Design a protein with these regions (language model features):
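Hydrophobic/small residue at the entry helix of a nucleotide-binding pocket
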Residues: 1-2
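Rossmann-like NAD(P)(H) cofactor-binding subdomain of soluble oxidoreductases
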Residues: 5-7, 21, 26-28, 35-112
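A short, Lys/Arg-enriched amphipathic alpha-helix followed by its capping loop at the start of a domain
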Residues: 8-15
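Short beta-strand element of Class I
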Residues: 17-19
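Internal alpha-helical scaffold of NAD(P)-dependent oxidoreductase catalytic cores
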Residues: 83-93, 109-146, 158-196, 242
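Short pre-catalytic strand/loop immediately N-terminal to key active-site residues, enriched for Gly-Thr
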Residues: 95, 143-149, 201-206
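NAD(P)-dependent Rossmann-like dehydrogenase/reductase catalytic/cofactor-binding core
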Residues: 184-252
């Protein structure tokens, strides 16, 4: 996720210098400094993108090099503000951030939550993240597990749906590669229309549907016993619950 955000910042030509600390990365863009270990320098903004299980080690290495007014942006699913504050004694603020891979192209929805963040820090975070997509500040930290499921994990679910559409098209006789191109282009176009139309998706679906037509026949299958709605709800719930499990593990 951090790599996608970095790509988005570089594409937007954000006026900042970037240092990536990664013991296994082999290459980064030319404008980025890659280090194997945390340097003996001071940083004003730290983006934390490790696995939750590595939080303690990351904190031991990073906390000493953060300036007194540094901002910590955490991508860690399940790592709550209290857990982060106990490991990173910073005054600038701690913000939990949940984007997705579309940050690389400036199209990610981004859920954010912080407590006791100054107006100046909030403005700085907004300015930094705005090039990556659309920002949604959340009213409560308890909403982040749901945002992680919907926004962070959501692209994988959409990709699976595109894969299923392509496979279904191939099963109807289309060339598999052609079916995949058609499915991808269809989803891209439908999403673009939904994003620009001043109508809810349900209304757009009705616009496509003629009584007794082909679309109506397909929707009968999708809507039978609310099959699609139940499947999606169960999928998001499973991802949400896993986030809660990760939070419990971080709390110890």
């Amino acid at each position: 996720m951090g790599g996608a955000m970095l790509a988005g910042w570089l594409a937007a030509e954000v006026p900042a210098s970037f240092t990536v600390v990664d013991p296994v990365a082999t290459e980064v863009p030319a404008a980025v400094r890659l280090l194997r270990e945390v340097p003996a320098e001071r940083f004003d903004v730290v983006l934390l993108g490790v696995k939750p299980q590595a939080l303690n080690d990351a904190a031991s290495a990073l906390a000493p090099v953060m300036t007194e007014q540094a901002l910590l942006l955490s991508l860690l699913a399940g790592a709550e503000l209290a857990s982060l504050a106990a490991r990173f004694p910073v005054n600038g603020g701690i913000v939990r951030v949940m984007p997705n891979l579309a940050a690389a192209v400036g199209k990610s929805p981004i859920g954010l939550y912080a407590a006791d963040l100054s107006e100046a820090a909030r403005a700085a975070v907004t300015e930094l993240l705005a090039p990556l997509g659309s920002l949604e500040w959340l009213a409560g930290e308890d909403q982040l597990d749901a945002v992680t499921a919907l926004v962070g994990s959501g692209p994988a679910f959409v990709y699976r749906f595109i894969e299923a559409l392509a496979a279904g098209g191939a099963a109807l006789g289309l060339d598999p590669a052609q079916a995949q191109r058609l499915a991808l282009s269809m989803v891209e176009g439908a999403a673009s229309l939904a994003a620009t139309a001043n109508q809810p998706p349900a209304d757009l679906a009705r616009r496509v549907t003629s009584p007794g037509g082909t679309t109506a026949a397909g929707l009968v299958v999708l809507d039978q016993e609310a099959a699609l709605a139940r499947l999606v709800a169960d999928t998001l719930r499973a991802a949400r619950d896993r986030g809660a499990e990760l939070a419990a593990a971080v709390r110890g």
